A protein has these predicted regions:
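Terminal amphipathic alpha-helical/low-complexity segments used for targeting or macromolecular assembly
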Residues: 1-61, 171-202
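Structural signal for interior beta-strand "rungs" in well-ordered beta-sheet cores
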Residues: 58-165
């Protein structure tokens, strides 16, 4: 992702910015520029130099992105302080990450051990997402949420442990519909019970 594209992303996501020059003051811009270089080196096998760049970028920006992480277009890291993105993370396009977010592993497993974040996801400040799990397209992860399992697309997740508020709303509506049906059945049963045997035989 070019610096021009990163600046466009910042301007699209942050109403506080007033000019393209101001975008160069954003730590998220520099974190992405350095990651682009580090990722190229990492993929070419220059692991030490790639890590050197990523660690230098962490000191300069407060954002730690492992050079092995695969990041799509349009990632916006707002504020940025304390963001950690692990080695095997895969991040889609147009993802928004706020400060204090961790996309980490759950142990010493090898191979794919970090989250996959699909396009359009928003991750609130302080959220922790751990393990080889998938965050579905356009899902929203609330601030300080702890996520340890796959999250369906278009879900809204809050709390620790994380709860799917969209799913809860769906369950509430289903329960309400069942309640109406039960009340209708009870009314029908009461009507049947009120009919005397004499009336039934006639």
């Amino acid at each position: 992702m070019t610096a021009k594209r990163i600046i466009q992303t910042i301007r699209q996501n942050d109403p506080a910015i007033r000019s393209n020059r101001e975008a160069w003051l954003y730590p998220g811009l520099w974190a992405m520029i350095f990651h682009r270089w580090a990722n190229k080196l990492y993929r070419s096998g220059c692991f030490f130099l790639a890590r050197l760049i990523s660690q230098w970028a962490r000191r300069r920006t407060g954002i730690e992105i492992h050079p092995g992480a695969e990041i799509g277009h349009g990632l916006f890291i707002d504020h940025g302080a304390g963001v950690v993105i692990g080695e095997t993370c895969i991040i889609g396009d147009n993802v928004l990450i706020y400060h204090g977010v961790t996309l980490g592993g759950t142990g010493k497993d090898e191979g794919k051990r970090h989250p996959t974040v699909e396009s359009g996801v928003v991750i609130g400040a302080g959220a922790t997402i751990l393990g080889d799990i998938k965050i579905g397209t356009n899902a929203k992860i609330g601030a300080d949420a702890l996520v340890l399992t796959d999250i369906p697309a278009y879900s809204t997740i809050v709390g620790e442990p994380a709860r799917n508020t969209r799913l809860e709303a769906s369950l509430r509506s289903e329960i309400a519909a069942l309640k109406v049906r039960v009340e209708a059945l009870e009314k029908s049963l009461n009507q049947l019970n009120s009919i005397s045997p004499k009336n039934m035989s006639s």
